[in-house]
UniProtKB/Swiss-Prot annotation:
A GO cellular component entry from the record: ribonucleoprotein complex
Function field: One of two assembly initiator proteins, it binds directly to the 5'-end of the 23S rRNA, where it nucleates assembly of the 50S subunit.
SUPFAM superfamilies, alphabetized: Translation proteins SH3-like domain
Annotated protein name in UniProt: Large ribosomal subunit protein uL24
Transmembrane segments: none
Gene3D superfamilies for the chain: 2.30.30.30
Stretch forming the signal peptide: none
Length: 104
């Protein structure tokens, strides 16, 4: 299946405790159908001390299911993603709301 949401995309959270928050995708896990969004879905984890790292309670991002994310178009509005074949034969992503091509 083609990736509708990719690393570097600006997205908005549709459901859950972070509903309405926006951020940039910095990792996608296609096998799990989840993505990590910077500054969204933060959880606290207890980190054991190591020689290189200090121990304590740290905050880090937790993965969000792709169905709970929507891509933001150039105007900053959430949109669904479609695909079309470009003039040179490559598959490009398009915003369903405006029909504009999505860079990526």
């Amino acid at each position: 299946m083609a990736a509708k949401i990719r690393k570097g995309d600006k997205v908005i959270v549709l459901t859950g405790r972070d509903k309405g928050r926006t951020g940039e995708v910095f990792a996608v896990r296609p096998s799990e159908g989840r993505a990590l969004v910077r500054g969204v879905n933060m959880v606290k984890r207890h980190q054991k001390q190591t020689p290189q790292q200090e121990g304590g309670i740290i905050s880090k991002e937790s993965p969000i299911h792709l169905s709970n994310l929507a891509l933001l178009d150039k105007d900053g509005k959430p949109t669904r993603v479609g695909f079309k074949i470009g003039k040179d034969g490559t598959k490009v992503r398009i915003a369903k709301s405006s029909g504009a091509e999505i860079d990526g």
